[in-house]
A protein has these predicted regions:
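P-loop NTPase "switch/coupling" elements that transmit nucleotide state to mechanical/effector output
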Residues: 1-30, 40-171
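Conserved lysine of the Walker
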Residues: 35
């Protein structure tokens, strides 16, 4: 399937997110099967953009359209890595500019009020798809990678990207 075909299948879920529903898009498969490519795509090749860049574009475009009828949205993003049973914030302070990881506060998964959250995980306000792309690049640069027998560029970790939308209608 092409990246466009894959996104066509998940696009209704992205719209549901803008409509106020919680949505999870999950890529699962064997090492080397294309999970990272499906989600991130190939930077610089418009036709090979992945689910995340296409979803961001759809969300920001829809938010701009809905502004005409009184809706405003605030977006924020976080990037969490799970590697060797440890949680790591892929966007420590200044990561966008420096491209370096620092030793963050201890991260742990918590459950409260029907929500799953990670205290101390940095959440960055995002205003457009290009800014999100830069943040994703910064997160990718500090992600754990190592060759395996199946894939010489394996990420060797699980990567959770979270986009939070808060929508309000003034009418």
């Amino acid at each position: 399937s092409s990246q466009a075909q894959v996104f066509a299948d998940v696009s209704p879920f992205v719209q549901s997110c803008v409509d106020g529903y919680k949505v999870c898009i999950f890529a699962y498969g064997q090492t080397g099967s294309g999970k990272t490519f499906t989600m991130e795509g190939l930077r610089g090749d418009y036709d090979k953009r992945g689910v995340v860049p296409r979803a961001a574009e759809q969300m920001f475009t829809t938010a701009a359209e809905l502004k005409l009828i009184g809706w405003t949205y605030e977006f924020s993003a976080s990037f969490l890595e799970i590697y060797n049973d440890e949680l790591r914030d892929l966007l420590p302070a200044g990561a966008e500019a420096k491209g370096k990881a620092s030793v963050p506060a201890k991260l742990d998964i918590k459950h409260a009020g029907g929500e799953v959250h990670v205290p101390n995980l940095r959440s960055v306000p995002v205003t457009d798809a290009e800014q999100l792309s830069r943040l994703m690049d910064a997160a990718t640069r500090v992600r754990a990678t190592s060759a395996t027998k199946m894939n010489e560029h394996s990420s060797r970790s699980h990567y959770i990207f979270r986009m939070r939308l808060v929508g309000k209608n003034s009418k």
